[in-house]
Amino acid sequence: MQHGAAHLHYCLPRLLTLWLDFTENIEDFVKKKGKSMTLAATIENASKVIDRFLSSHWRSLIPDYFFLTALPQLVSRLCHPHAKSFTILSSILTSLLSGPHSQQTFWHMVAVSKNRNQVRSSRCLKMFEEAKKVSKQMRKTLEDSITFASMIDDLCDKVKTEKGTKSISLQEHMRSLPALVNRSDGIILPNQRNLLVTLPTGNTDLQQHQPFPSGLVYIQSIDDEVAVMTSLVQPKKITFLGSDGRRYSFLAKPKDDLRRDSRLMDYSCLLNKLFKKDFKSRSRNLHIRTYCVIPTNETSGLIEWANNLKAIRPIIYQLHKDEGRYINVKWTKQYESPEGASLEVKRKNLLQCLEDLRGPVFSNWFTNNFTDPQSWFIARYIIITIIIIISISIIRMAFVRSTAVMSMMGYIIGLGDRHLENINVDTTTGDTFHVDMNCLFNKGETLAVPEVVPFRLTNNMVDAFGPVGVEGPFR
């Protein structure tokens, strides 16, 4: 790590794990009866050597921004029982909080400051206080950020709306939020651009490298109108004006533990790095679409809004409607099997449903949405047709490959609840985009109606793969 970042994602997590795991259990091991005094003394001395080395050398060995890549791992160890190791851990986090990457560190720690575990939250708050002592500007920035996060919590949990409400005004429901945003100039947008570190390549000077080369985007103002989503918990879509003049939207979601989603995004980002390292996956542009998830407490938080997305279910419903078949809750109810029905009855109802649907229709969406017949001219008919075929093929290929990647990843982590409202498609690139990933580690197998398939591969999904189905790029 002293000589470059090529192996940072392998080395740093392992170094931290070995160090913190070793010192976490050392006192119990030393005190355990039946152990050789010589062995116990050797282990204790080894711990002291490690702690002494880290406490005096970590700043000079690697730059601070390297630790931004391992922030979730560092923050998860705030309850570390070994006093000396925690002192070093605390110094690393406090240094990040009070340095040039203060805001990035804050967004990773804000939820921990409100944790129900008193030791964890008190230690986090103490680090905040230590960072505030650096300068008046640092104090103001951190205090504004803490207040901003608390207001987001209030917007999620305390601002109630009537069923059917499509939007609310912040001036009517939470005037203090736009007032804070207008008077503060140091709160960065919690999106991937601001939080995802760009590591140096080649012979770049590690200390001089800029980990955020595009520059940071700060919150300038917030739109008064807040859209209210129609789902059960009624999350709210808020839009900020960034310091670069662009608008950025986020979903303020209540009554949901977003810490799992946040860790899953970290996992997805790591997989993307592995895909880029491998020639075959890189040439196929294999990747997972990611977005920023910031828990602001244990039950709510902010989710970066992704544009140009459309859930697959309404797409398929509209395609059936265009062919004269109207699918709604009442229509699907007639095919539901009663509780305790035999497998034969369930099979019969399913086959009847599929027969009435008259086959899959999802492939029609690609043909309908990635052509422009009005631009056709008779003299250019052949050329335009070829261009359209190529365009559809590229979009379809992106859909197939992104579906394959998400199917593999979902199988590995036991991802369930993959109904067509949770699978979106990008209307500009064709990529699949999965949301609401709370059903993890094969939890779907424990539901009242167990999920017995590893990923979604229904007839409509296969239909969108093209003539070769699963035997082509998907496999």
Regions found by a protein language model. Give the residues of each.
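Intrinsic disorder
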Residues: 6, 44, 61, 65-68, ...
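Hydrophobic two-helix hairpin corresponding to the core of helix-turn-helix DNA-binding domains
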Residues: 47, 71, 85-86, 93-96, ...
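Catalytic-loop signature of eukaryotic-like protein kinases
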Residues: 417, 421-424
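Eukaryotic alpha-helical scaffold "rod" segments
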Residues: 2-62, 185-206, 342-360
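C-terminal catalytic region of ATP-dependent kinase domains
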Residues: 22-26, 33-39, 51-120, 126, ...
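Conserved ATP-binding subdomain of kinase catalytic cores across diverse folds
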Residues: 198-398, 402-415, 428-433, 438-443
